[in-house]
Amino acid sequence: MNKILPEMKSTQNLISSSPPPPLIPLKSNTSLSNLNSKITPNILLIIIILSIIFFISGLLHILVKFLLTPSRESREDYFDNVTALQGQLQQLFNLHDSGVDQSLIDTLPVFHYKSIVGLKISPFDCPVCLCEFETEDKLRLLPKCSHAFHVECIDTWLLSHSTCPLCRSNLLSGFSSHHNLSSSYLLVLESEQSSRDMVPVLESNSQLGYDVNNDSESTRIRSGRKSCDPDGDMDGLDEKVVPLEVKLGKFRNIDHVGEGSDQKKNSISGNSKNVDGRRCLSMGSYEYIMDQEATLKVHVSTKKLSGKDRVPSHRTVMSECGFDPTVKGIEKSVVERESFSLSKIWLRGKKEKQKGTSARDSDCSFVSSSSLRFPNHRIPPEESLKSENSESLETKTPSFARRTMHWLAGRQNKIVQPSTSNV
């Protein structure tokens, strides 16, 4: 025990003699003092000036965007003078293009490929489907840029685009509301009937020219046959044949230039009909080259209406009218709400096609320059009286949206179909 006690005392003396650990200095006060020393009034002044500049530039941008934008007339003038490159840039930036209305597509002229004046032996190509034009193919012409395409190809394209697929020129600028009011010519091909058929709507008399008067506008439709008019009065129509220029081209390989290129072109054009009327252009680089030397034209018949037949309002198109089996409904709506363009044939059923062909066979023969064909079906006076008496008893078919709402609400409404008399 005597030995252990002095050893414990010695260890305590050693522990007490060791220096204490150093204290950690506080850096918070030093960092704040450093920031205060670094931020000077000059830096604060620069930050304030930059923020004011950005604020003023944003206000100027808003003023330029909303207050200094060009008017509608200047926009139309700009689109009329737009170039091909500007049209391509516009198509790239305006990806929300909803296309052209079907009624506007139906007004574009249609012609046969064989009716082109100045056509050479070598066939031209369609830039949309990459197929060669054949003699019996129907082409639709864009009068603004004079480019022609297959009817099915260009109709499908224009339903989702409002520009030419080749030069990207805007079609809507040439068919604005102001242009429609000032234009009094209707382009109809001389050797081709229109792609739209008229529903058999006639009055009790035997005249084919009639007026349809509405509260908002009046539309006058005249046929082009003098023998159908008992008085022979055709003062409202003046026919002129105007040749229109047609620009066509063909695909050529730009990788092989020389003597072998002509042979390859001929082999491509000769073997193009082997694969479902289409060619494979995935190998190599091809360009659609226009034939600048060839002067291709199509003779088009124009009809000029007199001053009393011109309507100072928007022209009623075929696809904007409804159809009612009664006589009063016929006077209000001249045609069915359907477009008879070739691009929408697949939407109609077989029965409807058979009805259209039978009605077409019974129509009276018009001249080929007439843009609208009126089937010669008369409405008997007895049937007209029956339809007038039964008009109050007939209930119109509700719309699809209303039927859907009734179905969702759980209602069961009886829909009475109007009985149409077969003429």
Swiss-Prot record:
It is a single-pass membrane protein. PROSITE patterns: ZF_RING_2. Its EC number is 2.3.2.27. One of its GO terms (cellular component) is membrane. The chain crosses the membrane at residues 43-63. It catalyses: S-ubiquitinyl-[E2 ubiquitin-conjugating enzyme]-L-cysteine + [acceptor protein]-L-lysine = [E2 ubiquitin-conjugating enzyme]-L-cysteine + N(6)-ubiquitinyl-[acceptor protein]-L-lysine. It is found in: Membrane. This is Putative RING-H2 finger protein ATL49. It comes from Arabidopsis thaliana. The gene is ATL49.
